[in-house]
Amino acid sequence: MMKDEVMIKSGVVNFVQQGEGLPVILTHGLAASLHDWDDLLPELAGAGYAGYALDLFGHGESHKPADHDEYTFDAVFEHFSAWIDSLNLADPLILIGHSLGGGLSLQYALLHPERVRALVLVNPFYDIRQLPPILQIAFRRKLLDTTLLEYLPYRVFRFFVDMSSVNFSIGQRRTHVMPKHIRYQTALDYTRAASGIYNIPRSLPNLIPELSRIQQPTLLLWGNRDQSLNPGSFPTVEQKLANVVASHTFPVCGHVPHQCHPEQLNPHVMEFLRDVTLKA
């Protein structure tokens, strides 16, 4: 795996690249990092794809402006799009996006359809109305002073990550739906993210009216216990997109099925990519 940085107009982009072949762009969600894809990247490389995963604007080791007003969906998209341009990839892209990364992937397909071969959407965030009502109010009215989050230690984030991972189902042997190393990385990513990123959801465009214009083959995957986004919102994407060739739900998983059960999710991705590339 090659770790690299590139300087673009909107600042440094930290990313990793693994494998050779058709390009696959992997994009994480809010308050996460490129480590979301630590399980999928090696599989892609082993199957003959070139996987590229970045830290989004304000996340991980990428550019983090001090001014919270700079954190908008458009700014994140510009940073993401300029990074893709910097890679100088000749082949059309396969876009894999989780949550906010799914919204960015959809927006990229809308604006640059000729550059996109296929889409894989994991619990995609495409409309602020997917959030629980209390979070919609908080994000829209800027009730939260997110600067305070910068002073919270790792152990506080780890406590909330661990609590959200507990499996309360009767008869389940596992106490957590996410492995320990994933919970560690998730909490660490929260501490590394700029506090301004929580301003991004309020500027998220409602993509629903535009989705029917996306013609590329799409795989839709989601966790049925998502507490961050309404799981009932994901079938809307399936109905609106013109070419969803397959979809699958993961009953035990919440917002991050790619980390909850990668051994179950990754085969769906790899099968979809094989079908897409065979038909190309």
Model region roles, listed by residue range:
Residues 1-25, 46-49, 77, 85-91, ...:
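Alpha/beta-hydrolase fold catalytic core
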Residues 56-96, 267:
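Active-site loop/oxyanion-hole signature of alpha/beta-hydrolase fold enzymes
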Residues 97-101, 105:
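Gly/Ala-rich beta-loop-alpha elbow adjacent to hydrolase catalytic centers
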Residues 130-131, 152-213:
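Conserved alpha/beta-hydrolase catalytic His-Asp/Glu region
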Residues 253-266:
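Catalytic histidine-centered segment of alpha/beta-hydrolase-like enzymes
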Residues 110, 119-150:
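Flexible "cap/lid" loop of the alpha/beta hydrolase fold
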Residues 213, 218-253:
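Conserved loop-alpha-helix segment in the C-terminal half of the alpha/beta-hydrolase fold
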Residues 16-63:
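Conserved HGGG/HGGXW glycine-rich cap/lid loop of the alpha/beta-hydrolase fold
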